[in-house]
Amino acid sequence: MRTYGKLNILSYNTGKDVTDESIIPVENIRGPILLISTEADTVWPSTEQAAQIVSDLQEHDFPYEVKSLTYEKISHFAIPMRSNTWLLKLMFRSERQFPEECAAERTDLSEQAVDFIQNHW
């Protein structure tokens, strides 16, 4: 797992005790699910968690579509942004080191999310 930036609280957000109360029963969701994660996430282990969610849903024969998008360079703020990217560059090293890649991934994310929403809602 890569550690890129100044804002890195990943170690704080991993290795926690899992209790029944802390588990979200995703299999009870009644509709399609779009998961978005990034390997450069320095806030929480989003790629591992997305994979776990997909696995849990498969084990429960989840009847709705589940789409998981995983990006490589984009920061924890894997959201469509066309302005104020300077703030992301200030907070996350991956955004500074790979601005073109992050912009391309953000464009893909925007297109994929809009397509998913239009096809399901």
What label would you give each PLM region?
Residues 51-54, 87:
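Glycine-rich, phosphate-binding/catalytic loops in enzymes
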Residues 1-24:
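Mobile cap/lid helix-loop segments that gate and shape the active-site cleft of serine hydrolases
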Residues 60-121:
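C-terminal catalytic histidine-bearing segment of alpha/beta-hydrolase fold enzymes
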Residues 27-33, 64-65:
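Short, proline-enriched alpha-helix->beta-strand connector loops that line the catalytic pocket
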Residues 29, 35-41, 50:
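Short beta-strand/loop motif that positions the catalytic acidic residue
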Residues 42-52, 61, 79:
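Conserved alpha/beta-hydrolase "acid-adjacent" motif
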Residues 57:
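Conserved hydrophobic residues forming the short capping helix/wall of the S-adenosyl-L-methionine
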Residues 39-42, 73-75:
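Acidic beta-to-alpha connecting loop that harbors the catalytic carboxylate
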